[in-house]
C-alpha cells in the first residue's frame, strides 16, 4: 500500500505509527526532507523538500505481493546555483506589474483619510463578522501587513492582506469560548514574535491577538457590556489557519464550517464597498 500524502510530516508519522498495513508514505506536502527516507515500525516515509531543490528516487523490491526492500534517496539538484534566464526575468516582472496594474484599477472605497494600524485592525474585525454573519471573531495582528486609506483598491488589499485564507465558523457556548480564549491568549504570548510559515499565511510574525465584538479580560468574557453566561451560544469566526494549524488544539476539536468562496481580503473588500468612510459609524 502506497500513500501519497499532503497532510504534512506530523500526520504522516502518525499514520505510520497507527497503520502498519501502509508500506510507503510519499510526502507531497513539500515542507520537509528525508535525504535517505525514514522508517517508522514497518512503514517507509519519503520526502524531497520543495522548489525542485531535490529529486526523490524510490526503489521498491516486491516479491509475491510483499514489499521486500525499499531504498529511498533525495538527490540535490543545486538549482539555486543556476542563473535565472533573462527572458524569464522580464516575463515574470511584466506579469507582476500587469497584475498589480489590474488590481490598482479596481477601486474599492474612499475612507476619507489614512487609517491608523488600530483602525485598520478594527475594519478587518468588523468586516469578517458582518460579511460572514457571525457574532464574534478572534484574529491576530500579524495578518494586517499595512494600513488602509484614504483610497482603497484591490491592490491595497492584496498588500495589506496577502494571505490565502478563508474563514471558519464555529458555534460555541460561553464556556467553550472561554476555553478557546484561555488557550489562544496563552499561546499567543509565545507566538507573538514567532515567524509563521505555511497554511496560507503570507505575513511575517503572528503578532497580538485581537477580538471583535467581545472582550476577554482577567479570565472573563464580556459581550454587549455584560459577562457572558457559560451556556449562551455564539457564532465565532476565525481564519482557517487556526483550525488547520497545531497551535490551538481546543479549536481543532470543534466542528467548524469552512466558508467559501471569499478570501479574507475579499470579505474586507465587500464590507468597505458597502460602508466606505462610514465604516466606524455603525
Model-assigned labels for residue ranges:
Residues 1-4, 24-27, 46, 136-139, ...:
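Structural recognition of the beta-strand scaffold that forms the well-ordered cores
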Residues 1-11, 108:
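Short acidic, glycine-rich surface-loop motifs adjacent to enzyme active sites
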Residues 2, 25, 60, 128, ...:
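Divalent metal-coordination and catalytic microenvironments
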Residues 143-282:
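Feature captures C-terminal
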Residues 23, 133-135, 234:
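Conserved acidic residues
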Residues 62-152, 158-160, 270-282:
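A short C-terminal boundary segment appended to hydrolase-like catalytic domains
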Residues 12-102, 188:
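Active-site-adjacent helix-turn-beta-strand microarchitecture at beta-sheet edges
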Residues 5-8, 28-31, 49-50, 141-143, ...:
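Active-site metal-binding loops of divalent metal-dependent hydrolases
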